[in-house]
Amino acid sequence: KMSGGIIQNPCVNSSEFQTSLKGKNIFLGFMHLQSLDSKTAQLICDERDRNGNYKSLDDFIRRIPIGIEGVQILIFIGAFRFTGKQKNELLIEARLLLINFKPENRGKMLFEEPVQEYQLPELKRDFFEDAFDEIEILGFPVSCTPFDLLETKYRGSVFVKDLLKNHKKQVKMLAYLI
């Protein structure tokens, strides 16, 4: 990140099981999703390699044997951002799709049935909601620094670059221990 890389949350169409680099984008691998089964994570990549990118949430659910918990994890981490839909909208859509889904309908169909689109009210998500979702699922925030989550803008009286100038002086600073 300090060398110009852009860290991206996992995406069902771009990420691999392990973290991968595509140009300047560093796509976190599905292996980092603490609550997602590793077999499912590997299957997402294998299925995409065999049959191409996922076109929609519906396409994903038809191709991957996954329950609502797994879909929710992927939605909360932003793995379906290619759809252009808000997370709240995707959550509702996932529940509507999975409530009547039959496993025998999984896989390629001769004729794709159109998914009924529902007109939902626009639900806003807060910057903090996304950051805390990332912390819960990955263990660390990606969309911001941990300092952005603090209630105060105070960052200390001295920065690392100034430590030598303040040798043997008492100073205050904020640090992120990894």
Predicted regions located by residue number:
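OB-fold and OB-like beta-barrel modules that bind single-stranded nucleic acids
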Residues: 170-178
